[in-house]
Amino acid sequence: MGKEKLILAYSGGLDTSVAIAWLKKDYDVIAVCMDVGEGKDLDFIHDKALTIGAIESYILDVKDEFAEHFVLPALQAHAMYEQKYPLVSALSRPIIAQKLVEMAHQTGATTIAHGCTGKGNDQVRFEVAIAALDPELKVIAPVREWKWHREEEITFAKANGVPIPADLDNPYSIDQNLWGRANECGVLENPWNQAPEEAFGITKSPEEAPDCAEYIDITFQNGKPIAINNQEMTLADLILSLNEIAGKHGIGRIDHVENRLVGIKSREIYECPAAMVLLAAHKEIEDLTLVREVSHFKPILENELSNLIYNALWFSPATKAIIAYVKETQKVVNGTTKVKLYKGSAQVVARHSSNSLYDENLATYTAADSFDQDAAVGFIKLWGLPTQVNAQVNKG
């Protein structure tokens, strides 16, 4: 009787490479690597998995699907965990889990493995998502089971013919996709240490950024960014392009001590140039086009959605319901913003929309004023009536 098939979420790094060598004794390992826009050498990763002992190796380009179905709902909801983190890694885990489950069904695998430790959020995100999509699949976490130190991993790798990555001395743990880059470990673990320049990878230091500001126009249609400077492109390409444009101006650096799902605090360095520009630009179009009641209520749901996504509940009914509400609000979010990029700052300096609720004739203090000021007297009387009655009854 042959071995059971196992789908491994493969990154090409030391942990998941050692996992292939460890798992192949009991399973037929099928390595699956998802391209979510991190810019890795995917051909090398594909071949490396086979060299170590995977029976099959797949590279899945999911950039467009990731952008359209995961990043876009988060953008439209201004999803920022603890009002600071645009959910870079948290957004990619659901689509990775989804594709792992699809590959398990396609290949007849009964088990999925991931390379997460027992200390981070991602183990929860993967396993909760997989259980939501197919509760019959078994999930194992080799790295969590080993509890090995890095030196023990290297010893095992050398003994089992696993190639040692060239950047093994890099003290940082980095995760990247088209929505941004996350960095932790090394000197960053001490929150009193300023992050050294070497900790950043996709943004220039604001001090080294160009001395001249750059202005860009971003066009939105139904809440979706569709063009930069009138050049239309897919959402994935637009985000990747904006990462380069804004990154060279030092935009999107975030230094955050966050509350992890597993109960500890963690210091993270994020670089999210496109995300920070798009979040600011999108909010400005909403400010023009949404009625006051929606503008005031939507942030309550935005905060809840941010927590749901961070806390591994992308596939929960609550997440689905909030995303549906947000999508309904986006029908009028059409227009263009002009954004000034300069030394770490992205400032929206102009905006217009065919759905704008801003009426200059109502807002102006010039002779063109069309606001009926006589109506204010009755409005004030009725608006303040409950307060007035309370004061009369309760003496203030």
UniProtKB/Swiss-Prot annotation:
Query: Which chemical reaction does it catalyze?
Result: L-citrulline + L-aspartate + ATP = 2-(N(omega)-L-arginino)succinate + AMP + diphosphate + H(+)
Annotated L-aspartate binding sites: 117, 121-122
| Domain of life where this protein originates | Bacteria
- Give the EC number: 6.3.4.5
Alphabetically, the GO molecular function entries are:
argininosuccinate synthase activity; ATP binding
- What are the binding positions for ATP in this chain? 9-17, 115
Gene Ontology process terms (BP)? argininosuccinate metabolic process; L-arginine biosynthetic process; urea cycle
Question: Looking at the UniProt record for this protein, which Gene Ontology cellular component terms does it annotate, in alphabetical order?
Answer: cytoplasm
**Annotated residues for binding of L-citrulline:** 85, 121, 125, 173, 258, 270
Q: Broadest EC class?
A: ligase
UniProt pathway: Amino-acid biosynthesis; L-arginine biosynthesis; L-arginine from L-ornithine and carbamoyl phosphate: step 2/3
List locations, semicolon-separated. Answer: Cytoplasm
Keywords assigned: Amino-acid biosynthesis, Arginine biosynthesis, ATP-binding, Cytoplasm, Ligase, Nucleotide-binding
NCBIfam families per UniProt: argG, PRK00509.1
Q: What is annotated about its quaternary structure and interactions?
A: Homotetramer.
The family assignment reads: Belongs to the argininosuccinate synthase family. Type 1 subfamily.
- The name on file for this protein is Argininosuccinate synthase
Encoding gene, per UniProt annotation: argG
